[in-house]
Regions:
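Secondary-structure transition motifs
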Residues: 46, 51-53, 57, 73-75, ...
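N-terminal type II signal-anchor transmembrane helix
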Residues: 1-53
Length: 477
């Protein structure tokens, strides 16, 4: 026989369940009629978002509870979000912000924003002539929310890395350690990037930015379809991962089907400003507060296109380049290179010295280069009947765009017991008549061989189409 106290407890429990079910039903019906305004917590939400925006005043028209866009969950929305300058002026405006509140603070009656996703608004990134970086969550002309100072004189590499990591600490402050906000994102924002020193300018109508804290790691992810000079577009992405103590970081940049001129200003491209071909590129940079730069490597895959040089235009069949950059020695090390699609390959590591001097050269100034290859294997079926293997190769010269030529002041290589030395130039000039007139490539080379060179090695290095009778004679000998 059931005790009376047990029956009473069961009746109370059933009553609570019924009340809860009725409450859920009423809430579902009310939400189906439209959002429920919760303006009583507006001040709390404004304060939380203001703290995430470096203390800038944030205004909200109203806060409401509604079904998510997918209709399978509830979400809190801040409608009509504005970021002000502290004097009543509006710097940026977002249509709405979707907000996630922390569960544990709610249990003790405290409102704490855990994540916020803004829709719309504007962002501006400006690189100043002195190298300082200003990031503003607002249109062009807005005061910077984040400032990464310019590089001081006589700054060591380790000091520069430490300064960049300090700048990341400022950038990640909204979701940094010790705060309740774990995620901050902006969707479909108007993005403007300005390079005041190089003269470049890029815009995007629907840029996305996300700051997130996951355990002991912080992550910034951004993607946008940038529009640069001449209306060229470049889908680009950026990802920065660091730890909550900002001791190290990895920066990854990528671009898909982008023209170089859409990503970089002419000043940044230097002698390569005339390159016009679709490109997929990835660059990874690793930084450590104690060791400096620990990783700097990238890959670029080019499609068919053209290159302009002093009024002439030349066709490119595409190719692939992979390499890494040694900052301490200012040396670019290329470990994979292919041209003319995949038909032409160069095996071995190519060391390019004084890379910064090459990139600093203006488009109309000679760009000097110094290239060394400890051992290399040329596989160029269109020019040589067999792969050519050389060692101790060094090529010194300059790209002279004004002369439409590449000068070689020193070419040195070794094949077996023979040492080859040469100088000359590779040039382009108008040739032909009528419909056949066009830009043709020419080669002028003066060289000599010291030591002994096997006739078979000569045949391997003999260019196809040059003195075929002599080459056949050597082959029969």
């Amino acid at each position: 026989m059931i005790r009376r106290s047990t029956l009473i407890a069961v009746e109370i429990l059933l009553g609570l369940v019924a009340a809860f079910a009725i409450g859920i039903g009423v809430a579902w019906w009310r939400l189906s009629q439209g959002p429920i305004e919760l303006n009583s917590i507006r001040d709390h939400v404004e304060a939380e978002l203001s703290e995430a925006r470096s203390g800038r005043p944030v205004g909200i028209e109203r806060v409401e509870l509604a079904w998510s866009r997918r209709g399978n969950a509830l979400e809190l929305r801040a409608v009509g979000v504005t970021v002000e300058d502290g004097q009543g002026g509006v710097l940026s405006r977002s249509d709405e912000a979707r907000i996630e509140l922390g569960v544990l603070p709610l249990m003790i009656g405290r409102i704490s924003v855990a994540r916020a996703e803004f829709s719309g608004g504007a962002m501006t990134v400006t690189r100043k002539p002195d190298g300082a970086m200003h990031i503003a969550f607002g249109p062009e002309g807005s005061p910077a929310d984040i400032v990464i100072p310019s590089r001081p004189q006589n700054e060591t590499l380790e000091q520069r890395v430490a300064r960049l990591l300090d700048g990341m600490e400022a950038a990640f402050r909204p979701v940094g350690p010790g705060g309740g906000l774990r995620g901050l994102s902006v969707r479909n924002a108007a993005l403007t990037i300005i390079d005041e020193g190089g003269g470049g300018r890029w815009t995007a109508d629907a840029a996305n930015l996300q700051l997130a804290r996951r355990g002991r790691n912080l992550e910034l992810a951004a993607n946008a379809r940038l529009e640069g000079a001449e209306g060229l577009t470049a889908p680009a992405s950026l990802r920065i991962t660091t730890d909550t103590r900002f001791q190290s970081a990895v920066v990854e940049f990528g671009a898909q089907d982008a023209r170089p001129r859409a990503l970089f200003s002419p000043a940044a491209l230097g002698p390569f400003a005339g390159l016009d071909a679709p490109m997929n590129a990835t660059v990874s940079i690793g930084m450590d507060r104690e060791r400096g730069v620990t990783l700097f490597e990238g890959e670029a895959v080019f499609g068919r296109g053209s290159a302009e040089m002093a009024g002439g235009e030349f066709s490119l069949e595409g190719g692939r380049v992979h390499g890494r950059y040694d900052i301490a020695s200012d040396e670019l090390i290329i470990d994979e290179i292919a041209f003319a699609g995949d038909r032409t390959r160069i095996g071995g590591e190519i060391h390019v010295r004084d890379v910064s001097a090459i990139m600093r050269a203006a488009p109309n100034e000679p760009a000097a280069f110094d290239i060394s290859l400890p051992s290399v294997r040329f596989d160029v079926p269109a020019s040589f009947p067999e792969p050519v293997a050389l060692s101790n190769v060094r090529i010194v010269g300059a790209v002279v765009a004004s002369e439409r030529a590449i000068r070689f002041t020193q070419i040195a290589a070794q094949s077996g017991q023979g040492a080859l030395t040469a100088n000359g130039r590779l040039y382009w000039a108008e040739a032909g008549a009528g419909a056949n007139r066009g830009t043709r490539m020419g080669l002028q080379l003066n060289g000599q061989v010291a030591g002994s060179l096997d006739a078979r090695e000569v045949i391997q290095m003999w260019p196809i189409g040059l003195g075929e009778g002599a080459r056949e004679f050597l082959a029969r000998s």
